[in-house]
């Protein structure tokens, strides 16, 4: 009767485990990347919805007074969080975001901004208003595009 494993059996078992582990690492990386992409989509959507709600409220005259050069858009992202005075109300504010979401690719709350007057592909912000946001990450998507174009 034989006890234990031979060297060949141990090498074969170790090789199988190593092969399975080598296949699992790329799958785990892919899942982490996919999760970050999903979080980026959600964060961008949340901010863009808040920007649109601010613009709608400004167009309806629900908030004010507004600066003329802002064209009805928020001057900063922080204004969406801190709130804007409601028109006709003494101490009431209209808040559009609870907090500025964290960019999952850069792990910061610092987003790239574009104003209404900026070129759509511009990476420098004119500062007049916040018309759109994008990630400041220089990483590329799986299909070769830029996350900053989302």
What are these regions (language model features)?
Residues 31, 38, 67-71:
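A short glycine-/small-residue-rich loop at the edge of a beta-strand within enzyme catalytic domains
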Residues 52-150:
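Low-complexity, acidic interaction segments enriched in glycine
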Residues 9, 27, 79:
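Ca2+-coordinating acidic residues in Ca2+-binding motifs
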Residues 25-33:
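N-terminal membrane-insertion alpha helix
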Residues 1-3:
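N-terminal leader/signal peptides at the extreme start of proteins
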Residues 11-26:
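Alpha-helical hydrophobic helix detector
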Residues 32-59:
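Membrane-proximal N-terminal amphipathic helix
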Residues 6:
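Active-site-proximal cofactor/substrate-binding loop regions of enzyme domains
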